[in-house]
Amino acid sequence: MKYSAKNTALSQIDSNIILAVFEDGELSPTAMQFDQLSQGYLTRLIQVGEVSGKQGQVLILRDIPNCQAQRIFIVGCGKKDKITERQYKQIIQKTIQTILETQASEVVSFLNEIELKNRDIHWNIRFAIETIEASFYQFDAFKTKKGDENSVLNEFIFDVQPELQQDALLAITYAQAIALGVKHAKDIANCPPNICNPTYLAEQAQSLAKHSNLINVQVLGEKEMAELNMFSYLAVSQGSANEAKMSVIEYRNHPDKNAKPIVLVGKGLTFDAGGISLKPADSMDEMKYDMCGAASVFGVMYALATLQLPLNVIGVLAGCENLPDGNSYRPGDILTTMSGLTVEVLNTDAEGRLVLCDALTYVERFNPELVIDVATLTGACVVALGQHNSGLIATDEKLAEKLLNAAEETTDKAWRLPLSEEYQEQLKSNFADLANIGGRWGGAITAGAFLANFTKNYPWAHLDIAGTAWLQGTNKGATGRPVSLLTQFLINQSK
């Protein structure tokens, strides 16, 4: 859909108009203008109780005196000074739902007049677009009967004062790029595991080179990884007939060609049955989402290339499968990682860290400015934080602060977990340098502590998205998180 920012006299708009009204008869500035233009029409509707201003109410007006608009959407927003970001999202969703039912093709929105604490018009517009695009998303590639794609709404105009239009246009640019990145991440993550295997993931990575001439892609197969001594990564893949493949996506657009790159590493378990430590059958189908870390890194790289930010960024998609088979690795096995450290396997379902530890060692060759890994790593993180905040662990205070700031800017929320030396005690093994699990307590933290052993040569952060990467129930599907958070982080780094 086309988004734009313009400033047009209310009396001259001949398409469709969206106005905000609040409880207790309060009107937004443009709603006041409309009331004056229509000789008190809106005031009379409030007086007789037709318009309440309560959140969730959307009233459609037609044939209004002194107004050329086809329709006026009067949107109830609740208490003017108590609107939260969550409520703002709900207001946008309800408004779009109503508009689509009318078959309107063009709308002019004044909802950016809604005031939110510590938010500006840039945020209002950007968040509105991301919400609108999310409401349009559907994944029906494998359905014989496709969803309704016949919406006639093709232009959404934000009415913005001239002095704010440059900022509004920048918000539109950012929002559209991020929304595209989120969509691509969702599409890959929602794809079934009989289609989306490590080779498919690598093919998607290679397609990015066609999207942008700033991107080059290298794919490492099992032969190349064996030559690099990535035996921990390869052990996880032993039970699968599908070859493990690690895709390295290089984006280079920094004015200084020698500038150190930012590296993003995504866990790409295209299906995780748990291996010999087999998972319960209930909801095992959702383990196709164990590659959401890689999918989100793909989405970020897509958004990055669309925005052409002046950065050097490398995205790594660490793809493989963890399945039970006569060739599968076993509890009790001792693996030698690429770093040389040995790991005793106590549970084959704690496989993500075994893949990531070698990927995190591999990226040392790029002499990175910093490294962020993204992974659906632990159920313990879901127990600790639920499904609203991603878990953040970091060895660098400044990096942690920057990521939390990006999370706050985008509402792609994250919460920092501790990382102190005591947690390493839980990872001790009688037979190897490390055990791959740390016992029952603090599982999300001990998983991060395990990875920290392989990140000593650069600033590092870890995002555990096990609780935020997908939804369950009637709204089942990938969320595309944390594409928004990480893209905002990169935008901030480029300034």
UniProtKB/Swiss-Prot annotation:
GO terms for molecular function: manganese ion binding; metalloaminopeptidase activity. Its EC number is 3.4.11.1, 3.4.11.10. GO terms for biological process: proteolysis. It is found in: Cytoplasm. This is Probable cytosol aminopeptidase. It holds the Pfam family Peptidase_M17. The gene is pepA. Its main location: cytoplasm. The keyword Cytoplasm applies. It catalyses: Release of an N-terminal amino acid, Xaa-|-Yaa-, in which Xaa is preferably Leu, but may be other amino acids including Pro although not Arg or Lys, and Yaa may be Pro. Amino acid amides and methyl esters are also readily hydrolyzed, but rates on arylamides are exceedingly low; Release of an N-terminal amino acid, preferentially leucine, but not glutamic or aspartic acids. InterPro entries: Leucine_aapep/pepB, Macro_dom-like, Peptidase_M17_C, Peptidase_M17_leu_NH2_pept, Peptidase_M17_N. Binds 2 manganese ions per subunit. One of its GO terms (cellular component) is cytoplasm. It is an enzyme of class 3 (hydrolase). Mn(2+) 1 binds at residues 272, 349, 351. Its cofactor is Mn(2+). It comes from Histophilus somni (strain 129Pt) (Haemophilus somnus). PROSITE patterns: CYTOSOL_AP. Mn(2+) 2 binds at residues 267, 272, 290, 351. Belongs to the peptidase M17 family. Presumably involved in the processing and regular turnover of intracellular proteins. Catalyzes the removal of unsubstituted N-terminal amino acids from various peptides. Signal peptide: none annotated. The active site is at 279, 353. Keywords: Aminopeptidase, Cytoplasm, Hydrolase, Manganese, Metal-binding, Protease. The lineage of its organism: Bacteria, Pseudomonadati, Pseudomonadota, Gammaproteobacteria, Pasteurellales.
